[in-house]
From Swiss-Prot:
Pfam families hit by this protein: LexA_DNA_bind, Peptidase_S24
DNA-binding region: 26-46
Gene3D superfamilies, A to Z: Umud Fragment, subunit A, Winged helix-like DNA-binding domain superfamily/Winged helix DNA-binding domain
Family stated for the protein in its record: Belongs to the peptidase S24 family.
Source taxonomy: Bacteria, Pseudomonadati, Pseudomonadota, Alphaproteobacteria, Hyphomicrobiales
Name used for this protein in its record: LexA repressor
GO molecular function, one term: serine-type endopeptidase activity
Subunit structure: Homodimer.
Site (Cleavage): A123, G124
Length: 237
């Protein structure tokens, strides 16, 4: 389980290692995460090391090695482990990554698609499904596949190891079916909506979190209705 700051720091270290071949300095990490002191970076580094995501090499300055990434990779640049690439759009003045076409701001805006925000989705304990359109977000078309799409605000931390954080906007492709391994919007008993990985287990359906603090839910098919598949994330920094 990673907190938002731990996830952001791990991603920053990994991206810097790929770009420059060396990890960032503690001052650079502090500035990147908008922290006031380096003591906060020390705590985050220690937490990442204890969880097995990084390793500090002894007797070497600025020597940090990334051992593993959360389940879907944190930089969005490569293939995923299980069929979903967590394409992330940075809100406001951020860059679009990794697949959106990049041109002038005006051209990019003209090509964007208005995706309706339909409420909130639980990445944790299921919450009551909300089906009221509140506003729209502007999404590059390369982030979306065919068919209809909508967005839901993520609430909870049960999918953090898949790179899905509390407060993210989940981009959902409407679909009433899913393949095993897909991350889906599942409606349980027509009352509760949750964002989980979908798997079939014999005659039952398993809704799996990406956080060891949460349990897998095993339900009969008549209690679960698929409402869409996750295709991307919109995140504000």
């Amino acid at each position: 389980m990673l907190t938002r700051k731990q996830f952001e720091l791990l991603r920053f270290i990994n991206e810097r290692l790929k770009e420059a071949g060396v990890p960032p300095s503690f001052d650079e990490m502090k500035d990147a995460l908008d922290l006031r002191s380096k003591s906060g970076i020390h705590r985050l580094i220690t937490a990442l090391e204890e969880r097995g995501f990084i390793r500090r090499l002894p007797n070497r300055a600025r020597a940090i090695e990334v051992i593993k990434l959360p389940e879907f990779g944190i930089n969005g640049g490569g293939q995923t482990r299980r069929g979903f690439t967590p394409s992330v759009i940075e809100g406001h003045l951020g860059k679009v990554r990794p697949h959106a076409s990049i041109g002038s701001d005006e051209d990019s805006h003209d090509r964007n698609v208005a995706v309706p925000v339909m409420g909130r989705i639980a990445a944790g304990t299921p919450i009551e499904a909300l089906q009221t359109r509140s506003h729209t977000i502007s999404v590059p078309p390369d982030m979306l596949g065919s068919g209809e799409h909508y967005a839901l605000e993520v609430r909870g931390d049960s999918m953090v190891d898949a790179g899905i954080l509390d407060g993210d906007m989940a981009l959902i492709q409407k679909n009433e079916s899913a393949d095993t391994g897909d991350i889906v919007v599942a409606l349980i008993d027509e009352e509760e909506a949750t964002l989980k990985r979908f798997r079939r287990r014999g005659a039952s359906i398993a809704l799996e979190p990406a956080n060891s603090a949460y349990e897998v839910r095993i339900l009969p098919p008549n209690r679960v209705r698929i409402q869409g598949k996750l295709v991307g994330l919109y995140r504000k920094y």
